[in-house]
Amino acid sequence: MTSLARLKFYATQPHACSYLPDEQATTLFLDPSQPMDVQVYAELSEMGFRRSGDHLYRPHCQRCSACIPARIPVNAPELSRQQKRILKRNADLQVRGVRPAFSEELYALYANYIEKRHADGDMYPPSREQFNTFLVRDLPFSRFYEFRLDGRLLAVAVTDVLPNGLSAVYTFYDPDEERRSLGRYAILWQMGEAARLGLKAVYLGYWIKNCRKMNYKTEYRPIELLVNQRWVTLS
């Protein structure tokens, strides 16, 4: 175990919340001068921290505790009929993990995804600079898992491989392949990959009960939420 007591953290000023209208958010960041050590990252992930670009962060709001860290234990998944159908529907895809690097093919998929799925969000409009800063970080534990059909790129799951699990950083995919449910499939695939690697969980980021865009996270069972500094199974 690493001593976390020596680490420094910084809180932002209140800013508009990306998920809940009319709410102000505060974010706690690990001191960016601290090297991105995989063991520190793993221990902080147990405390609800996430990675964005070169930064580790978690919500630190004074008046709101709606953002609840969520993870899926992978040793005994309880797949629904819909999830089994999604796995079967995508059995023809080939997956490979590569080190993060920019390519026009990747950016075109990302830009199309943002434009068609998140035109109302703070990541719109997409740009190459945004894509590189957010996702293309050459970190030894980070992978781009590419999902292809006969060579055609359909989805990318940006994933950090930690000692305690896989952290699902971001997934983008072809929005025209709606029937495949590629976002949900990427999580199911990550669950299988975590189990194959002998890891205990897939870390999904934050679940917000009153945010419709977050509802999909509780489709995966069992799922654990970090409540009062303890991981508890959602019943």
From Swiss-Prot:
Coiled coil: none annotated. The keyword Disulfide bond does not apply. One of its GO terms (biological process) is ubiquitin-dependent protein catabolic process via the N-end rule pathway. Disulfide bonds: none annotated. It is found in: Cytoplasm. Functions in the N-end rule pathway of protein degradation where it conjugates Leu from its aminoacyl-tRNA to the N-termini of proteins containing an N-terminal aspartate or glutamate. This is Aspartate/glutamate leucyltransferase. The lineage of its organism: Bacteria, Pseudomonadati, Pseudomonadota, Gammaproteobacteria, Pseudomonadales.
